[in-house]
């Protein structure tokens, strides 16, 4: 399992320009961070003045990132995420993703989306643009069952799951 300091070191050690292999590693480390559901840990891989658009919400800087993620994971319970590389070039990476979660009434959702990332020279994300759609699902339709935290290496990705 990756400890936060190792993951943070690895995330920032992968610097532009990206190769296919380094972009895949960057995507997996981002997935691992978000699956930790630790807003402070996640915020440290973004620049101090990072700019986000997440759905219709605009977030600026690490402090707002922590507040945003704290609200997000208080609402999106039992959150499990899979990210997959879509495209990359120089200092940019595009991913597609899906995550499953339920609300406090027990209603399950699978959220699908795309993110565009831009990194600084140190490998920290300086811009993040996310478009996300929520699909209500039944508990029987769930596909992400690993224990909370990092997705096991042998768990299928989005393409293998047909998502």
Where are these regions (language model features)?
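A beta-strand edge to alpha-helix "cap/lid" segment located at domain peripheries
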Residues: 2-18, 67-163
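A short gly/proline-enriched turn/hairpin at secondary-structure junctions
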Residues: 13-15, 49-60, 72-75
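Short, aromatic-enriched amphipathic alpha-helices that serve as compact interaction elements
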Residues: 19-36
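Short, well-ordered alpha-helical segments enriched in acidic and aromatic residues
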Residues: 36-49, 53, 117
């Amino acid at each position: 399992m990756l400890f936060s300091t190792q993951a943070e070191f690895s995330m920032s050690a992968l610097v532009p320009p990206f190769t296919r292999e380094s972009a895949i590693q960057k995507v997996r480390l981002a997935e691992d961070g978000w699956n930790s559901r630790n807003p402070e840990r996640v915020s440290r891989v973004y620049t101090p003045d990072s700019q986000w658009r997440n759905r219709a919400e605009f977030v600026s800087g690490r402090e707002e990132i922590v507040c945003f993620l704290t609200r997000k994971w208080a609402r999106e319970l039992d959150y499990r995420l899979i990210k997959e590389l879509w495209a990359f070039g120089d200092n940019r990476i595009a991913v597609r993703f899906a995550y499953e979660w339920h609300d406090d009434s027990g209603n399950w959702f699978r959220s699908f989306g795309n993110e565009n990332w831009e990194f600084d020279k140190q490998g920290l994300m300086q811009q993040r643009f996310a478009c996300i759609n929520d699909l209500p699902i039944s508990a029987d339709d769930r596909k992400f069952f690993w224990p909370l935290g990092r997705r096991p290496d042998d768990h299928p990705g989005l393409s293998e799951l047909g998502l």
